């Protein structure tokens, strides 16, 4: 895999280790962990092509002449991508970009005095060095401007991992942090971590009352009604805040107290800085309602809080932490709460407890090694998500007909068969029904996701409808999946991500995070809604008698939502990737499934006109993550393969009658293809919480394959211009 960014002038100033000694291990549940082996072990276990690709080594693949037809280009693309399929049938992904994740893992190891695994420290340092901005700091993600949050967290990481304060990288980072006003301007999550490290006072952290979990479930603002990622992050934060837990002072902590702030640490009145947030960090300011609630809660904590209620609150919070740990086998829903839960368990049960040891081991699942160094991924992988789309691309493009590709498809189907959740979670952890669902990553994490379940279901149905493949997922299990999906439709007729919305969007008035938008509750999304529509359409063809009327009613209502969400200019806003091209691909697909095309549907016509107005002279499309941040279509300097594929797919979905602009885009995809069949990574593709970009590097591969093959089927496998 080509590096997104390498800065040799900086990386050579720190320890370099032999990258060829890394090996990727896959467990029986599809979990992915990197291990740094000895030279003797490496000789017995040569690097695979997939490992070479991820680590940035030359694959020494034959060079192909440029493809002459779209389908040949798609075939070249899959000839490359199939080499990356792992032995258990899935495709892996770095899923990198956010710069506030690695700190959690490093802090958990440091606070618990757990030695870092071999190879971690030098590789993490390399990654952070390679992703420093020109001003010396770090942003909230790798393409973002330097912020107090990113710079302070990653500065502390470098110091914990052994970088001297006088090192040029540390000096530049510290100078940039001070230019931004110092760590006193950290947002809520940053203040929490610094307080946990004993580098900030808990009095300066806005209240995170664990007593909220004692409220009756029917109360509209009960945390069990929040978006699952937020409630599962504020759960351990509340436990830590309630107990005011922090690691002991040592020489490094005392040095960090001096280095992180512009003022003398002992002179800072931290309580005065609960709401001090750097302007460059602030994306979602506090509402007056939240500030008033925080003032009331602070008075409660200071003067009124009975010790018995505090004990009940922290006890209930820890019970829920244990439920989350047990239901995910300590993987947790994501890396943020995984690290926080690890710290909570360390303080509550001790370093020798089985729970803590399991947590520390599970943190390995989030770590990834690539040319720039070691990073922490946005989840413990994209196993089910990536495999589902790859299967769809192979079927929809017609490449499944090639005998050489059939074993790959069979292995991928077997993987999805194993990943369907066949047991219900235990305990009252506020999780949505998971029986029959597919998770985003793997079955260990096990959270229901509406679009992953839908895309996996559709992939299984497409493959099992072909004559050469076993029907591994039987009818009863397919029906369980449909049951899960049908229960997830929101009142506004759309579908959210993990579960139906449980309370109103007014909860966003209480968003305390400052750096993220639309996080407090579940929202409906055109992308998730379309995934559901297409999966249910495929299911009714496969099993036409099951809940037919309910399915048709659900689809019709969902289509109404998709139409309603179109903007006046013909676009849809994408919340899970960048941005308007991504949403257009999904929305036009849902309409096409109902027989609505350019010629008979004004909604499709407006969508096509919007997309064509954004096509660039070279035939491609381009979108920056800033489109998600601002809600306004924003381009990067050059056309991008992934966004071009999405825009073309939308036009093909709508059956746009003039093939010339579509063909122009197809020619761009073909011309952008490298001689080994792959396409180059230029920019991140994904987004979450409106403000954080994240990479899906396989998108440029399977979506290009999908679009090229789909064009050949619908418009003919030839070019006229």
UniProtKB/Swiss-Prot annotation:
Gene3D superfamilies: 1.50.10.20, 6.20.120.20. Signal peptide: none annotated. One of its GO terms (biological process) is ergosterol biosynthetic process. It is found in: Lipid droplet; Endoplasmic reticulum membrane. Lanosterol synthase; part of the third module of ergosterol biosynthesis pathway that includes by the late steps of the pathway. Erg7 catalyzes the cyclization of (S)-2,3 oxidosqualene to lanosterol, a reaction that forms the sterol core. The third module or late pathway involves the ergosterol synthesis itself through consecutive reactions that mainly occur in the endoplasmic reticulum (ER) membrane. Firstly, the squalene synthase erg9 catalyzes the condensation of 2 farnesyl pyrophosphate moieties to form squalene, which is the precursor of all steroids. Belongs to the terpene cyclase/mutase family. This is Lanosterol synthase erg7.
